[in-house]
């Protein structure tokens, strides 16, 4: 019984599409990351771009008129940034996205059609009222009774399934199975008026479709008609081997082109099956469910893989192969271009020769740049960018030309291949990648600029002033072409007829979506030093090709410590920056004094105020002057230092007045700390003195909360006087929490107040007579908080102790959020939305709603009771604090025993990330010349730490602190040496040339081609952990590839039995498929050398002590036993070896395997060994040292394709978790007493869990926590056993934990999972339980009653429920 929990979401972008989704006038980007759907909007910012800047294209010529010869070195450009609107985890794997102009959507925009791996289609729209996806319908076709599915056909998971949609939204087609096509028609407005209905002969579809009214009288209410499955062989009997299809532009009826053949294509059969592909165009009759063949082009090259439809003026489609690109127009006329020498050998089709380009088009992506010219961008497998241009003769294509984009024009800004691309309009493209970071890039064209300048249209002079939406309407590539006038067609055709000159296009990176996919190898540092910045808790090798990198992940934030000092008995710190008041008679708004604001130290903090509570009960305040990171105590001014405890310090009156809040009074000072005002706190009716418990600043307002739960508001006038503000709406009411909120998006200041009953009141400072917003149901923590929301039961309320409204975001985008803290330190985050949208003249609270965001942070858990008691002392209570500029972030900090930051990037959701170290008493911003935009905090040890956020670190995309170091090469393996080194196995592609002296290929003719294949040449790099610089490099033999690297503690002397940490490297020498593969095992030791001048980190090198060539690849290495031996998988054997003093490896034991060993894992402190075979499953073996012997204990009884595996011990049971090639986790158990285990020789199959991500590594972890068990199951033996977990990584970039569960915990969590599935929204209408349940192996489960692995991701969504649903769920499971 286990739980699988994703602790980091997928980051590999698999699909992307652009459409107006949020509203009819919006321009949104939809991104699919395997099982995560994200919705973005674009925000334009103004940035400075340096001419010839590093890593970016110099597009100055495209942004200025040709007459302006003296272009400045620094120029201002509009840069587009991605802003996340929402993200939705899916219970399915996305295989395609398509846009549909559906009728009557809630947002009055277009709908999104999502296709999933198991032949499902979901039609979704945006619901502005709930700020969420709304599923219109779901259609599924995996039913084995669907016509056209034969029993011998391949399974759905083994076929290429994809979705394509008609450009005019008349229908969509899902190709699934071997050759089946599911057609889903959509109603059009003109068809709806004619009462078009084809539902009388409805094909078999999902129950969800019928429930939405697909049949009967309600059919006219749905935006779709009944779908039907059409076997491709019904269209043409020769379509037995379809390759690809796509709908085409400019046809009156839905029309698609298909590449297919009647026989299977293969490079090995080229002499017999040359040019056997056929391109056929069919038009569909949706009413008759029939088709008509329009044209057929036979004799096409065998390697064509893709159909790319082109709109007017080019029209037709591009057929993309590995060695050529062919254009077929609407009349069937073809034009092609060969891009390398192999095109002559693989086809006899007539092609123009551009073989000198030597391109490899495998895995390339094509995207239309401009509809005016018809130019197409090609992104190759290595990220290189080329431009395909057309020459027109009238309206016919006469020739095609491919040109490379020079590096100076941005041709190398992409590091790896693209998985998807989409055109966002206005010269912006999104390039998604599964192998590295995804890029939002911009392009400009000098020819377009000149053409636009010479145009006489009125819009040409107003382009710069047009809004994003207006310009998008002009540049939309998907506009209906039927309404184009003849004049427009003539202009576009003339533009396309002009050939594009080389160097015309210039590309520049606008924004980046960070990615850690694919994860290739992992190094763990569970006990790392908290002060180390470059040594993450998890070190990952990520990316492919030139996008390869090393990424350091930290679960908590480890700030850069600049200085620290001891401040005994302190409990509060505040940094203060005060400005001198302007002379009398001069009134200047903040920000208008340009000269003063431009000075370098205009915002630097001058004072640090520290409040202290001594052990004898006395309280005092100390003022320090700040000089960089140095503090010096000062007696300057009249600042109150001895009378009472300082509760808060802030500034008012545009920063000219310093305000000190004491227990019983408020004092104001000038910029030199000279006394100006004393405001006592007294009861207005009785005159009794009242103590202050909280204060909140929002210039020019000050909110004071007093011990009788009353609230007073003060305002700084123009002359600096702080006066009481009459607030009749606030008087006579008790308030549990109160704070002020001032956003960067509006000027009004609001007061957020919490009633003891859990109600929310928002007051505008300009209207304090009554609240501008009332939400009585905040205490119920509903998923959507509105003014009129009220649940049926009024008793199920959460205990809310504090609320705080603040902007969250970065320099690009900030938005208001409401943070709610409960009595057990849980944080609930609400995002402010407006539905319907408000006008700019309305108050911000008009039509305001709050949407609860999903967040999975759990407060810090402490098992040490003494520490917990200490954390409850005065000064350790949790409080929230909003800071507006911490290294560019607008953030909220939670102080107390579980300190945390709430951080958000513009393209990510808010994430709660804990602050490492001790509990935090107080925290303040700290901005000086030595600590730019940093912070200072006081921890439980009375240490003041002046810190900054770590540089070049992302937080929001993973919920981890992630720092990436590019390696510019793919990293295959990674290991850590205790001397402080990382050993990295990389490779460099190089051209392969046949050896003229090769005796194995004597029958081959002499090689004459210049277009040679590329093979990898392995390189070992050594990186210092502190500086992240490469200090040593070892180049391996030609064609030698690194497969694994491990740090082993081996015995290096047979006489003294000395042990030493060494580096073992396993490699493969790949000579071709017709020769046996060899491998090498290399053993390196780390030696100390004389460092290079000024580089002390270069004092270590690797020294080769063993190099042993073996038959077969060395695919896995591990340490074994207690005598310092190693075990290695060499070919089809697993062999135990010992290191001798003469530099040789002595074999002492071995075991024969069957195919290819993918993993070797040992259980620490035992002789147990787990070996995984790529085709034959898992082997559980043992090793003994007296005598040296290996023995087989048990094997999996099914033929698993084992990718990786590991042990999972729990209590007195031993489980084995195997990750297979179908993205499943197989749970096996070694139980020799079970009758089905045949005496232990067969591992029991306990359960199967589908992850949806292709696995890469597994690592056994020992947790610092202990699993809670019911008292009746607890024994003195099991209670002391440590809890183990398995960390899983995947090629999608996910991190996941597999946690074993006790019987009682499993039963309760299983009940909660059932409760959550019932009440949580499932995006796209998918079944989460069915998604996680994999197919049952032959022979069924061995556990009698199957105990499926729990979906921890579902359980972590517990916070999305309202308090009423939570209590219902807890009541069902007995909590």
Swiss-Prot record:
Pfam families xref list: Beta-prop_RSE1_1st (PF10433), CPSF_A (PF03178)
Superkingdom, taxonomy of origin: Eukaryota
InterPro entries attached to this UniProt entry: Beta-prop_RSE1/DDB1/CPSF1_1st, Cleavage/polyA-sp_fac_asu_C, RSE1/DDB1/CFT1/CPSF1, WD40/YVTN_repeat-like_dom_sf
GO molecular function, one term: RNA binding
Region annotation (Disordered) ranges: 194-219, 446-477
Compartment annotation: Nucleus
Keyword Lyase belongs to the record: no
UniProt keyword Transferase, yes or no: no
Biased composition (Acidic residues): 461-477
Alphabetic keyword roster: mRNA processing, Nucleus, RNA-binding
Disulfides per UniProt: none
One GO CC term, this protein: mRNA cleavage and polyadenylation specificity factor complex
Primary localization: nucleus
Annotated TM spans: none
Listed Polar residues bias regions: 446-460
One biological process term in Gene Ontology: mRNA processing
Family of the protein in this entry: Belongs to the CFT1 family.
Function as written in the Swiss-Prot or TrEMBL entry: RNA-binding component of the cleavage and polyadenylation factor (CPF) complex, which plays a key role in polyadenylation-dependent pre-mRNA 3'-end formation and cooperates with cleavage factors including the CFIA complex and NAB4/CFIB. Involved in poly(A) site recognition. May be involved in coupling transcription termination and mRNA 3'-end formation.
Protein name: Protein CFT1
Lineage: Eukaryota, Fungi, Dikarya, Ascomycota, Pezizomycotina
């Amino acid at each position: 019984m286990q739980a699988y929990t994703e602790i980091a979401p997928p980051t590999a972008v698999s699909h992307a599409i652009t459409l107006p989704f949020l509203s009819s006038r919006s321009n949104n980007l939809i991104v699919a990351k395997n099982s995560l759907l994200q919705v973005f909007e674009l925000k334009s910012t103004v940035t400075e771009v340096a001419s010839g800047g590093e890593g970016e294209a110099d597009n100055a010529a495209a942004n200025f008129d040709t007459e302006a010869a003296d272009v400045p070195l620094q120029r201002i450009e509009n840069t587009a940034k991605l802003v996340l609107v929402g993200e939705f985890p899916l219970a399915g794997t996305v295989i395609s996205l398509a846009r549909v102009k559906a009728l009557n959507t809630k947002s009055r925009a277009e709908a999104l059609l999502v296709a999933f791996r198991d032949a499902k289609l979901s039609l979704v729209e945006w619901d502005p009222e709930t700020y969420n996806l709304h599923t219109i319908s779901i259609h599924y076709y995996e039913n084995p009774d669907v016509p056209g599915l034969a029993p011998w056909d391949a399974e759905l998971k083994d076929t290429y399934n994809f979705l394509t949609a008609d450009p005019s939204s008349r229908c969509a087609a899902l190709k699934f199975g071997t050759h089946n096509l599911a057609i889903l028609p959509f109603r059009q407005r003109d068809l709806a008026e004619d009462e078009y209905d084809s539902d009388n002969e409805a094909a078999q579809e999902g129950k969800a479709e019928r429930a939405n009214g697909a049949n009967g009288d309600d059919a006219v209410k749905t935006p779709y008609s009944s779908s039907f499955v059409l076997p491709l062989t019904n269209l043409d009997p020769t379509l037995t081997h379809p390759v690809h299809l796509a709908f085409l532009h400019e046809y009156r009826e839905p029309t698609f082109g298909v590449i297919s053949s009647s026989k299977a294509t293969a490079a090995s059969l080229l002499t017999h099956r040359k040019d056997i592909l056929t391109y056929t165009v069919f038009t569909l009759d949706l009413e008759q469910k029939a088709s008509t063949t329009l044209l057929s082009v036979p004799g096409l090259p065998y390697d064509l893989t893709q159909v790319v439809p082109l709109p007017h003026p080019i029209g037709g489609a591009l057929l993309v192969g590995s060695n050529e690109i062919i254009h077929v127009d609407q009349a069937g006329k073809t034009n092609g271009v060969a891009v390398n020498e192999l095109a002559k050998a693989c086809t006899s089709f007539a092609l123009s020769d551009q073989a000198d380009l030597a391109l490899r088009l495998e895995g390339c992506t094509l995207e239309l740049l401009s509809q005016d010219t018809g130019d197409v961008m090609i992104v190759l497998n290595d990220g290189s960018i080329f431009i395909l241009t057309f020459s027109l003769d009238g309206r016919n294509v006469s020739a095609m030309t491919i040109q490379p984009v020079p590096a100076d024009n941005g041709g190398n800004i992409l590091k790896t291949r693209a998985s998807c691309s989409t055109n966002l309009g206005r010269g912006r493209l999104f390039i998604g990648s599964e192998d590295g970071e995804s890029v939002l890039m911009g392009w400009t064209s000098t020819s377009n600029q000149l053409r636009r300048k010479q145009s006489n249209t009125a819009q040409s002079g107003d382009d710069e002033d047009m809004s994003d939406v207006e310009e998008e309407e002009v540049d939309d590539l998907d506009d209906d072409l039927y309404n184009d006038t003849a004049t427009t067609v003539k202009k576009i055709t003339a533009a396309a007829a002009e050939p594009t000159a080389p160097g015309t296009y210039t590309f520049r990176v606008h924004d980046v979506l960070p990615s850690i996919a694919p994860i290739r190898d992992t190094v763990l540092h569970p006990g790392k030093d908290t002060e180390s910045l470059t040594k993450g808790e998890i070190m990952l090798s990520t990316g492919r090709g030139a996008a390869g990198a090393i990424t350091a992940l930290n679960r908590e934030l480890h700030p850069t410590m600049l200085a620290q000092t001891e401040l005994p008995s302190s409990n509060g710190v505040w940094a203060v920056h005060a400005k001198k008041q302007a002379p009398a008679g001069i009134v200047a708004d903040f920000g208008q004094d340009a000269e003063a604001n431009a000075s370098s130290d205009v915002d630097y903090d001058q004072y640090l105020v520290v409040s202290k509570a001594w052990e004898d009960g006395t309280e005092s305040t100390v003022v320090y002057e700040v000089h960089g990171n140095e503090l010096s105590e000062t007696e300057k001014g009249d600042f109150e230092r001895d009378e009472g405890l300082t509760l808060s310090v802030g500034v008012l009156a545009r920063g000219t007045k310093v305000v000190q809040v004491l227990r019983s009074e408020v004092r104001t000072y000038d910029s030199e700390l000279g006394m100006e005002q004393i405001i006592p706190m007294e009861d207005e009716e009785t005159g009794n003195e009242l103590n202050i418990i909280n204060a909140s600043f929002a210039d020019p307002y000050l909110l004071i909360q007093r011990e009788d739960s009353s609230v007073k508001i003060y305002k700084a006038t123009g002359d600096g006087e702080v006066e009481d503000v009459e607030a009749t709406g606030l008087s006579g009411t008790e308030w549990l929490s109160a704070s002020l909120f001032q956003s960067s998006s509006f000027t009004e200041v609001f007061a957020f107040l919490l009633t003891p009953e859990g109600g929310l009141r928002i007051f505008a400072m300009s209207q304090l007579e009554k609240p501008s917003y009332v939400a009585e149901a905040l205490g119920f923590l509903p998923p959507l908080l509105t003014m009129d929301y009220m649940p049926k039961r009024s008793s199920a309320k959460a205990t809310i102790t504090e609320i705080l409204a603040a902007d969250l975001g970065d320099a690009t985008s900030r938005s208001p959020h409401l943070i709610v803290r409960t009595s057990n330190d849980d944080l609930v985050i609400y995002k402010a939305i407006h539905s319907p949208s408000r006008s700019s003249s309305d108050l911000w609270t008009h039509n305001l709603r709050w949407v609860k965001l999903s967040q999975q942070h759990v407060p810090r858990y402490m098992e040490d009771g003494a520490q917990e008691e200490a954390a409850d002392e005065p000064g350790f209570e949790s409080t929230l604090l909003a800071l507006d500029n911490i290294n560019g972030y607008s953030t909220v900090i939670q102080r107390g025993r579980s300190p945390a930051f709430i951080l958000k990037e513009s393209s990510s959701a808010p994430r709660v990330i804990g602050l490492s170290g001790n509990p935090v008493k107080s925290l303040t911003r700290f901005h000086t010349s030595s600590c730019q935009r940093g912070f200072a905090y006081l921890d439980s040890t009375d240490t003041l730490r002046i810190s900054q956020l770590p540089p070049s670190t992302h937080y929001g995309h993973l919920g981890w602190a992630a720092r990436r170091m590019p390696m510019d090469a793919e990293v295959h393996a990674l290991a850590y040496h205790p001397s402080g080194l990382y050993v990295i196995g990389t490779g460099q592609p190089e051209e392969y040339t046949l050896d003229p002296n090769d005796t194995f290929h004597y029958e081959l003719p002499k090689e004459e081609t210049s277009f040679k294949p590329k093979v990898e040449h392995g390189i070992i790099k050594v990186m210092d952990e502190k500086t992240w610089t490469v200090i040593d490099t070892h180049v391996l033999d030609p064609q030698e590839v690194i497969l694994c690297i491990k740090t082993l503690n081996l015995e290096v002397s047979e006489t003294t039995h000395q042990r030493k940490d060494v580096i073992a490297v396993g490699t493969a020498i790949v000579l071709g498929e017709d020769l046996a593969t060899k491998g090498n095992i290399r053993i390196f030791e780390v030696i100390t050398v004389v460092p290079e001048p000024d580089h002390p980190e270069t004092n270590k090198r690797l020294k080769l002590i063993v190099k042993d060539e073996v038959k077969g690849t060395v695919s896995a290495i591990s340490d074994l036993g207690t005598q310092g031996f190693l075990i290695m998988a060499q070919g089809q054997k697993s062999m135990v070896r010992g290191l001798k003093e003469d530099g040789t490896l002595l074999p002492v034991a071995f075991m024969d395997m069957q195919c290819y060993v993918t993993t070797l894992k040992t259980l620490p402190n035992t002789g147990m060994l787990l070996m995984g075979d790529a085709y034959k499953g898992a082997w559980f073996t043992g090793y003994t040292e007296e005598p040296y012997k290996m023995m087989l204990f048990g094997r999996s009884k099914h033929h698993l394709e084992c990718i990786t595996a590991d042990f999972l011990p729990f209590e007195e049971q031993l489980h084995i978790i195997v990750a297979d090639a179908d993205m499943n986790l197989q749970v096996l158990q070694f139980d020799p007493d079970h009758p089905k285990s045949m005496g232990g020789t067969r591992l029991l199959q306990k359960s199967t869990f589908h992850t949806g991500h292709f696995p890469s590594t597994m690592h056994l972890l020992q947790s610092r926590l202990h699993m809670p068990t019911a008292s009746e199951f607890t024994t003195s033996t099991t209670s002391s056993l440590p809890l183990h977990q398995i960390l899983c990584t995947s090629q999608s970039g996910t991190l996941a934990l597999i946690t074993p569960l006790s019987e009682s915990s499993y039963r309760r969590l299983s009940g909660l999972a059932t409760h959550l599935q019932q009440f949580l929204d499932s995006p796209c209408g998918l079944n989460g339980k069915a998604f996680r349940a994999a197919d049952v192996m032959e022979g069924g489960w061995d556990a009698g009653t199957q105990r499926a692995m729990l979906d921890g991701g579902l359980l972590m969504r517990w916070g999305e429920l309202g308090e009423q649903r939570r209590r219902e769920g807890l009541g069902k499971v007995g909590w």
